[in-house]
Amino acid sequence: MAAEEVTLSSHIQHHLTNAKMCSTDAGLAFNKACADSGFWTWHVDTLAWSIGLGLIFLWIFRSAAKKSTLGVPGKFQCFIEIIVEFVGDNVRDTFHGKSKLIAPLALTIFVWVFLMNLMDLIPVDFLPSFAGFVGETAFGMDSHDVYMKIVPTTDINMTSALALGVFILMVGFAIKIKGIGGFIKELTLHPFSSNNVFVQILLIPFNLLLELIALVSKPFSLALRLFGNLYAGELIFILIGAIGFMQLPLHFVWAVFHILVITLQAFLFMMLTIVYLSMASSDNH
């Protein structure tokens, strides 16, 4: 057991494992007991951190709105206004339809994803070790059976949920602008078309297959891009932390670089969402 605890592979696996909760015939079960529970398993750390960071986002912007003034703004108000104007400019330049939903949606996505990514800069052992200490002292659990992933975007379930929301909005916008008939025509009459009715009917299955692949690949790529970059970043932090005293300068260099990564990934997720919704709202194929 001791040898297992100190191996690098077990250390990495422990840090990259979610805290799980599931329902069994015997009642609620946690972590390893949920190994065979399948789809109906809750990643409680992902849920807790993502909801908590979402509430922090709402609190920050609500506080800024309440304290805003028409006079000389303070530093906090200026900072919030810079973010709002930055997102607003990107929405105006990219989204060519008319919707009051897009700018607030883009702002929410950018800030929320950024805050979730930002958790990757917290030392990898700090909060998981604290959770293990609490589990061991307060609940008599083995600290190695206590899991906590503090970066929600390193969980494919979280990024998939975000991408699924974008996908639903894409389909909703397309149906709202083009109607159900127009949406079906877009899926079945493009990219191949013919003036011959019989040929066009024969082309429908091929068009439908290609358009469905193109449609589904958009949220799929959104989810995997965000997850892959943040998961790899977290893994590198763990590997750096395993090399001893030399980790400090390497941690600093990687953290500085990773600040760019987490910001860029939040920006890309926001921009691609705007682009996809703009494409869905366009009357032109």
UniProtKB/Swiss-Prot annotation:
Gene3D superfamilies the record matches: ATP synthase, F0 complex, subunit A
Concerning InterPro entries, the annotation shows: ATP_syn_F0_a_bact/chloroplast, ATP_synth_F0_asu, ATP_synth_F0_asu_AS, F0_ATP_A_sf
Q: Which keywords has UniProt assigned to this entry?
A: ATP synthesis, Cell inner membrane, Cell membrane, CF(0), Hydrogen ion transport, Ion transport, Membrane, Transmembrane, Transmembrane helix, Transport
Residue spans crossing the bilayer: 41-61, 102-122, 164-184, 197-217, 226-246, 252-272
Q: Which GO terms describe its molecular function?
A: proton-transporting ATP synthase activity, rotational mechanism
Q: Where is the signal peptide?
A: none
Give the way it sits in the membrane.
Answer: Multi-pass membrane protein
- State a single Pfam family of this protein: ATP-synt_A
Query: In which broad location class does this protein mainly occur, judging by the first location in its UniProt entry?
Result: membrane
CC per GO annotation: plasma membrane; proton-transporting ATP synthase complex
**GO biological process, alphabetically ordered:** proton motive force-driven plasma membrane ATP synthesis
- Provide the protein's localization: Cell inner membrane
Q: Which domain of life is it from?
A: Bacteria
Query: What CDD domains does its record include?
Result: ATP-synt_Fo_a_6
Q: What does this protein do?
A: Key component of the proton channel; it plays a direct role in the translocation of protons across the membrane.
Family membership: Belongs to the ATPase A chain family.
Q: Which HAMAP family match?
A: ATP_synth_a_bact
Subunit structure as annotated in this protein's UniProt entry? F-type ATPases have 2 components, CF(1) - the catalytic core - and CF(0) - the membrane proton channel. CF(1) has five subunits: alpha(3), beta(3), gamma(1), delta(1), epsilon(1). CF(0) has three main subunits: a(1), b(2) and c(9-12). The alpha and beta chains form an alternating ring which encloses part of the gamma chain. CF(1) is attached to CF(0) by a central stalk formed by the gamma and epsilon chains, while a peripheral stalk is formed by the delta and b chains.
Tell me what this protein is called.
ATP synthase subunit a
Q: Which organism does this sequence originate in?
A: Pseudoalteromonas translucida (strain TAC 125)
